[in-house]
Amino acid sequence: MFSESEDAFFDYKSFKENQVLEKAFIPPTPQDFFMDKPLSMANKDPFEIRLVIADLAFTGDSGREKNDHTVFMCMSLHWKKFRFERHLDYIETRPGGGADKVVLRLKELFWDYQADYLVFDNRSGGEAIYDFLSKETEHPERGNAWNPCGFTVVQDKDLQIVPWGKIEELSNRTVDPNAMPCLIPIIGTGDLNSLGWQSLKKNLETNNIKFLVPMQEAKDCLVDSGDYFKMTSDEYAQAVMPYGQTDETIQECVNLSAEYKEGKIRLKEPRSGYKDRAVVLSYGNLVAERLDNRYAKANQKQECDLENIQLVW
């Protein structure tokens, strides 16, 4: 049962009405990989864009709050008329760990989800996290079936959110000379966070963000289909985990209370609560908004070019 805080910024109804996605992305286990099992959500639409979004916590990071933990999200974007519809396909949380292990998991999700961009909070771990991301990463299990290349920032001012000088600075820090340009770093500020919350609320209220169905519904589907009876306990836990994480994300969001000061919105979690998942969701939505604008401009230009061709004809 979900409950909202009395001064909740988000309305539970805007989440509940959009819990319609039946199929979650399920990352492969080491056994899946060695058995050459097909990747989950392997069929990617021609105009679909996929994001891996992360807020990272590290062991011994004194700058983090005690209730912080690492959050990974997988979000796919599907063009609908004049903007991308956001689908939240997967969520994973874990306690803080070493930067090398966190980055390895990030890169696993990037390749297994067939992502186009990796969005991450660059405050977490300082510049060290970028160094780990930008250098080659060997996989202890996948060997030659793994692309070890480093990642670097995307050289596109329309997509980047932090000041361009910071992008150039990070680009110059890149370790692997053959690094793939896929990174979109985020550095949260009061202004950016306020804009992010407002944009997230708008997209929720216009039914533009779709979520996985509730965990109980996912469990019932596994039983009804008979798949439940073929699964080990580990397989079952893995299959329902993203749905449970979605339920927790929604509860986390509707528990956030709003404070208004100097024209900005600040969201605050309950004393023993979290807002890590909500922050990651807002970051993914902000990047999706940048992609909305870019594709809308491209479509507008294409329409203008077609009109000019028709006039010449």
Language-model segments: which ranges?
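RNase H-like, metal-dependent nuclease domains and their acidic two-metal-ion catalytic environment used
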Residues: 1-154, 194, 198, 210-313
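Short alpha-helix plus adjacent loop in nuclease-associated cores
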Residues: 145-218
